[in-house]
Amino acid sequence: MQKQISLGELISHEKQNGLIKLGIRLGDRLLGLRKMQELYEINEMQGLSKEEFSDRLLDALNISLEFDEEALERIPKTGPLLLASNHPFGGIEGVILARLLSQVRPDLKVLANTALRVFAELNEYFIFTNPLAPKNAKNAPSLKQTIGHVKKGGALLIFPAGKVSFFDSKSKRVVEHEWNRIAGRMLRIPGVQYSPIFVSGKNSDWFYRVERINFKMRMFFLGWELLNKKNHNLRIDIGNTVTAKRIDVEAGDIELAALARAQSYAQEASWRSSWPETDAKAFSPLAETIEKAVLHNEIQSLPKEQHLVEYRQFSVYYAYREQAPNVVLEIARLRELVFREHNEGSGEERDTDHFDDIYTHLFVVNNETQELIGAYRMGQSDRLLAKLDNGDDDLSSIYLAQMFNFGKQFINRQEPCLEMGRSFLTPEYQRSFHGLYLLWRGIGAFCGKFPQYRHLYGTVSLSKLFDKRSVAIIKAALVKETEAVSPKNDFDFALHPEIKSFGEEFGLRQHMSAFLQTIEEDGKDIPILLKHYMKLNATFHALGVDKNFADTPGLLLSVHLPSAPEKMLKKYLAEEMTSYLTYPETAK
């Protein structure tokens, strides 16, 4: 018997009297189901497998898909997985995504509108629910089935809005409804991973005119909206999978559902932008390594009090250029080597400028190999700042004054400070506990010797290996702008309004890591140094672009060291902690 795409398939045949049958025929015409039936018959779709049916439907409508095959392949092949998408069309995206995602997850199930029962060939994909009555007790078994499927290690695709996207008169955009809290509940399932999806596109203008007249009436036109996607190119963007450990399960279901929604919007193609290409040909070869014996002799010649820390085979020192010119040259060479790995660097044989002549260089040496493994460049503001004839501060000797406009209220013009910058660790120490610890143990020892420095300030470079979306999220999550300082060259990439709205309601800071994982293809997390400053209770003031550092975004921050957690002060100040903390704040 020929299968019918008809409202009659949703109503028991025993209940279909003459009047109901007339209503079914009228409804089929009104809803476009009659046209679908013609499509069904002409293309001989009855009895096909779910895969064959999906392929033939897309062929019949001449719908072409645009998606990143590598992103599809990055979807986990096993284990509990939640996939969630926006719902721009109200129908065809369910068929498309079910077909596409089942290629990598044959165990995929899709939580779908009961209206899709008319496509009997696709029923094997679906777990049906009624989005028009989300609180209906009849939905409970399907929701229980979906949760059970995921708990058993299955993959589940949901459209948590439950309704097709609508035109928002305030933002003048087609937007998603709020996502059902079931999405948040599923993110709490132990071990579950989450892959956000965004389908670009919208329905016809007529569809949105109808919803302005009567919001519910638009549902009657979804069949026509499926048919009018004929000859369309549909773009699908699949985000990178968020692992369970980066999901903040302490948040409520509503917040987690809103997070999943914002992560879907983070994939929207029209809100992406690439960094300008760096001309690799413009980079000069690195300078030759300074001989170890030369470095050793200069280091041994430093005054004893400039030897700050001894730890295992490592030593930490500070020096000025006139004391150790070759050490500073080697630091500049290593800086350039490391910065180039992060799509930064000057392009010269060494990363150096005239500030190397007047700033303080704190560095770590491996005594066994006689190699430098890391360094910081520190500006002692009380040594650097001078007064102009008009009594104002001369900021020309402050490196970051090239990047930021410092008002009189900013700390570097109020008290002695250390400007921290140009930090690096050589590649073999970048993931080592010892590298970062020794740099900061050295900073702690320096502050112990010079306790007038209560505030540290500087920038954390946000490498252009990060996506612009990630940088914008970090800025929105951390920066609290004030009149005391502003960037001379602002980072002008606009954050997606739906992510911004999420941040205003729930906050972004606790969700930064989850956002970055779904954006960064290699799974990059918050930079280690930035995490370190966050643990020190840093204040974040502005995000600027450093024109002298390959146009790299720099996040300006400050740390009031006496207010840092006691555990960290003990770690870095060690025996000098008590004397440092009792040093009077008023002593300048």
Language-model segment annotations:
Residues 2-11, 107, 140-288, 504-506:
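Non-catalytic C-terminal accessory region of glycerolipid acyltransferases
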Residues 308-380:
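Short amphipathic alpha-helix that is part of the acyltransferase structural core
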Residues 102, 107-138, 146, 150:
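Conserved nucleotide-cofactor-binding alpha/beta core module
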Residues 249-270, 440, 528-531, 540-573:
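C-terminal/domain-terminus segments
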Residues 1-87, 94-96, 103-105, 123:
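Membrane-anchoring hydrophobic helices of lipid-metabolizing enzymes
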Residues 346, 383-539, 544-554, 564:
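Acyl-donor binding region in acyl/amide transferases
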Residues 68, 78, 82-84, 90-96, ...:
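Short acidic (Asp/Glu) patches
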Residues 281-322:
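Conserved N-terminal entry element of GNAT/NAT acetyltransferase domains
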